[in-house]
Amino acid sequence: GVSSHQIESIDRGFSFLKEDAPLDMRMGQAEQAVTAGDIVNLASKKELYEIFTKLGEESHARAISDAIVRARRIKALMTTGELAGIIEKEYHLGKNVPDFITAKDDKRVFQALRIAVNNELENLKEAMPKAIELLALGGRLVVISFHSLEERIVKLAFLDFKKRGMGEIITKKPLIPGLAELKVNRRAKSAKLRAFEKNI
């Protein structure tokens, strides 16, 4: 998954708070060809809508997709600041939307693009069974998810492992960060930890 180091690296383009960053978002810049900029500038309105809806769970996906398509007809969107500006200025123009609401829209759109660029959900689905196979007897598979779609994949995988008699789910409910953790690491706010112990 994405790391804090990658988020803080301005040349990676993961954060809408880094205004001059290129729209990249590739975790493996050497291996991957398609960037977030490619998706934003080349995907159809319908494709953008589906990405923002399915991967970002963005309720304003249609309006934001419309705004992006209108803007790129005039000029290709090259930076994170330009994309955030479309969301903030074009979509919210004249609607007196509070900054914290705008920031949530930014976050969901950027998150959806990052997931799409890196094929994160499919990679997680493929990694879960491979990880459990590599574990020794008594080994534990511990997964921290930051997104509801990721968490669902982990939950269903663990239930499948248990059904197949491979072991036991240690965390009946996901563990979430406490106040002490959140004070020093705000990015842990949406984190959920699940663990499975292999017994065969």
Language model features with spans:
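S-adenosyl-L-methionine-dependent methyltransferase catalytic core, i.e., the SAM/SAH-binding region
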Residues: 1-200
